[in-house]
Amino acid sequence: MKKVLVFVLLFSLVSFSPLHAESQNDDAPVKMGEIVVTATRDIQEIRKAPSNVTVITAEEINDTGATTVVEVLDKLESLQFRTYSGNSSQSQLDMRGFGGDNPFGKTLILLDGRRLNRTDMASINWLQTPVNTIERIEIVRGSGSVLYGDAAIGGVINIITRKGTDKPKFNASVLAGSYGLNDERVGVTGATGHWTYAVTGENNFNSGYRDRSKYSAQGGGFDVGYAANDLLNVSLGVSFNKTDYQMPGALTKEQMEQDRRQYQPALPAYFMNAHPDDDGSDKYTNVNLGFKSFWGAWGQMEINFLYGKKDLQMNMPSWSSYNYSDTNADTYGITPKYILAKEIFGFHNKVIVGVDFYNEPYKKDIFSDRERTKQLSAAEFTRESMGCYLRDEFNLLKNLIFSAGYRFERASIKGSNLDFLTPSNNFTDQKNTYNAEAYEAGLTWLVDKQSKVFAKYSTVYRIPFIDEVASFSGFGGNFLTGLEKEKGISVEAGAEFYPLENLKLGLTLFRVDMEDEIEYVYNPVTFTGKNQNTGKTRHDGAEVSLSYLWPKYLKVFGNYTYHTATFEDGANNKKEMPLVPKHMANAGMEVYLPFNLTLRPEIHYVSDSFLSGDNDNSTEKLESHTLLNIYLNYKPTFGNLNLTAFLGVDNIADVKYSSFGIDYAQYGMPNFYYPMPGITYKAGLSFTF
């Protein structure tokens, strides 16, 4: 840690020293197309990135009537969400077929560049970032291990919050809908002199489609920026959120036929309890202090000091008396980087070099009662990592870009467990260290003014979660010193073409081969199990997208995704991985009607997939489903007042479906499913001035 602080201090002194600085204004402004930050960790035109990239703006989010980030992302190619409760509070993301039984560490989620992924084996809470705080969301499909390291396998999603610009703007909205949905938002952004500011707040509540599936989320944030001069910018962003949620449990098919909206009843024949009291409460705080120093022809330096805090309370008496837990997880990060764009022999070249340091203390206490009067165990761990990366882009020709990069990362997990009931589960000061490398090389051919063709080869890796390495949650205690990281190779190629000015066609093909994937292996003889590096898997896929704009009349859009994910060795060789649908498709149109009205019908299709745990593909599948949605927007303008009125109906046909199911047939029990909401109505009103 001391070495890191010394490095950062020296880096900062050099970064913000004016001795070699030249005014940023010395460079003539360059006109760019649609830009993205996540693909290269710097401002970059989307079409120059060797990746399939999507950017969603705040205006697009507002037009959809979405109340959560999950609702925004779920209609994009290669993205699918599953949930245990029918709402967004416990959603799990499948990106590029990396769903399976452990999707948590296969897609990297960022908030303004800071990692949101948890260090334990659990999904992030997607409600921790209110949609009112979001300026844009950038989705970069495919490997990002060189630039971001651990977990950037299926892709990287960066949620970028609002920043102040220009004159002050005030916005507010209210939305209500079925199952007790109500959502209220307010915000103000602006700039004055050298200062910029943005303040937002949101309240989101839903009683839930099922009994015991209620959630409420309150959050907000602010961002303050100061441009000291042409050489230095300073920014401070802070966000917070509190989410309370219930967990209704799963149902058998017979129970769903009786009442698909009930919480899970008891099944004494299978020693399964009812779920009338399962719930949780999460609190999140995120802080990002950033400095940018512009050196003109000598490039620019950036450094961010990051802090995140998670206080998570979980109550699951339906499982056992061991399932009252408090988890406290902090994140301390320092991420300096240097960027230099310079011509070499008349050809454009840009190099980025940086360091990502994270220190993440983790503490979990388990109790025997909701009041936390009797503690059963206490576990404390620290995950620390430092990754150094280098990436370069060089124009071989004016319209042909070669990119290459390398990353080395060292991560350690160390900690102790104290079990007050079973001392044999105790361990002290155990430690694992992981060394990881990633490489990438890509080519991007710029065709005409808008189109591109690209190809990319890269390696990927994932460091084990704390609770994959250590067992400390009331089911034994051990520390697996031999558990290795997951690693793999990713290859992709694609194109985006504009055969007409307003017609965009996209196609991306990819393959990811993984090895040493971590799986819990159960021994039926000893009735025990542990996590092991079990073998190889393959993920093949294709992503197709289309959009066409007929100005003043309509916009047509659609996408299709093909996935196949298979085990490539062992007893289940060539069997399909669970919870990966082969086909997903979305289509819709915006019809621009008179009187500032816009009608948007949509269709959403997901094919069947094998149930969780069905590695040998021996039981029934999770059924396919097709959903129809329709929305109507009214957007008049009264001087400086911009108004949007919104009406929407999701799942018009009231389709009965589930997004998640578990194979219990292998244990002689019925399979279990998590029902999703039926037909849902919602309406809202927003204004900006």
Regions found by a protein language model. Give the residues of each.
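Conserved C-terminal beta-signal and adjacent last beta-strands/turns
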Residues: 7, 226-228, 239, 390-392, ...
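N-terminal periplasmic accessory domains that precede
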Residues: 69-72, 92-96, 107-110, 125-130, ...
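Short acidic/polar hinge/loop motifs at secondary-structure boundaries
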Residues: 114-141, 482
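Transmembrane beta-barrel wall of Gram-negative outer-membrane proteins
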Residues: 176-205, 210-249, 278-296, 340, ...
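Membrane-embedded beta-barrel scaffold of Gram-negative outer-membrane proteins
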Residues: 194-195, 300-316, 366, 444-464, ...
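Face-selective signature of the C-terminal outer-membrane beta-barrel domain
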Residues: 230-241, 280-422, 428-429, 446, ...
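Surface-exposed extracellular loop regions of Gram-negative outer-membrane beta-barrel proteins
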Residues: 250, 255, 359-368, 410-423, ...
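Gram-negative outer-membrane beta-barrel transporters
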Residues: 345, 397, 402, 410, ...
